[in-house]
Amino acid sequence: GIMDTLKNLAKTAGKGALQSLVKMASCKLSGQC
């Protein structure tokens, strides 16, 4: 249903945000930004 779709969208968006945060953090830590 609609709720399931929204939940899946939220999960996907959350994963994307987490991944970009991790990438930024590791890039800054390694000084490769």
Swiss-Prot record:
GO terms for cellular component: extracellular region. Keywords: Amphibian defense peptide, Antibiotic, Antimicrobial, Cytolysis, Disulfide bond, Hemolysis, Secreted. It is found in: Secreted. One of its GO terms (biological process) is killing of cells of another organism. Its main location: secreted. Disulfide bonds join 27-33. Expressed by the skin glands. Shows antibacterial activity against representative Gram-negative and Gram-positive bacterial species, and hemolytic activity. Belongs to the frog skin active peptide (FSAP) family. Brevinin subfamily. This is Brevinin-2Ef. It comes from Pelophylax ridibundus (Marsh frog). The lineage of its organism: Eukaryota, Metazoa, Chordata, Craniata, Vertebrata.
